[in-house]
Regions:
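A charged, solvent-exposed segment within the mature domains of Sec-exported extracytoplasmic proteins
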Residues: 118-181
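Bacterial N-terminal signal peptides that target proteins for export
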Residues: 1-7
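Generic structural signal for well-ordered, non-transmembrane alpha-helical segments
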Residues: 36-46, 50, 68-79, 100-114, ...
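Amphipathic alpha-helical coiled-coil segments with heptad-repeat character
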Residues: 24-28, 57, 64, 92, ...
Length: 181
């Protein structure tokens, strides 16, 4: 009886160690590209946002031009990221849900910024421009769960493998440094 029990325990140990998680494997090129695509979707908007904040609020024409640049940068970046992330697929079985939620967020964000472009273009460049542009953006938003972006970062940072990948990623480094890289 002891021999059979010992054999069963050993067999279970061998089988469970053979089925290691994704964490046990080195980062693949595709997984690194996925991390880069995730962070890369946010960098153009961050840079355009910094440029917008640097504008003199009294120069409404410059503020409008910078705001439109922000809308365009985000639209393009989210559309490109959606294509790249779809092409790459989920980085691992453990992150399939994270990938699906991120895909939805990126898609909704791209549509939101695209929908905001025309209403923002129609706005007069005056003292109320910024407030009116923010309202137009909020009114056209199609993002059902904005917290998904933070949840994606949290899920990746919980994983030593993906946390390290974020640390090595150039686009993620740009995000962390606020575009100062």
């Amino acid at each position: 009886m002891r021999t059979r029990l010992l054999a069963a325990v050993l067999a279970t140990a061998v089988l469970t160690s053979a089925c290691g998680s994704d964490e046990d494997k080195p980062l693949t090129d595709a997984q690194g590209q996925w991390v880069d695509a995730f962070c890369g979707a946010l960098v153009p908007g961050m840079k355009a946002g910094l440029e917008l904040k640097a504008q003199d609020p009294a120069d409404a024409k410059a503020v409008k031009a910078a705001y439109l640049k922000l809308v365009t940068a985000n639209t393009t970046a989210f559309v490109d990221a959606e294509k790249k992330l779809k092409e790459l697929g989920a980085p691992s079985d453990e992150l399939k849900d994270v990938h699906e939620r991120l895909m939805k967020y990126v898609s909704e964000s791209a549509r939101s910024y695209e929908a905001a472009r025309a209403p923002v273009e129609k706005l007069e460049p005056n003292a109320q421009f910024w407030e009116n542009a923010e309202k137009a953006l909020a009114d056209t938003s199609q993002v059902s769960r904005p917290e998904e972006l933070r949840a994606t970062f949290d899920a990746l940072e919980k994983s030593p493998k993906y946390s390290a990948a974020i640390g090595k990623s150039v686009p993620c480094g740009e995000l962390k440094s606020g575009g100062q890289r």
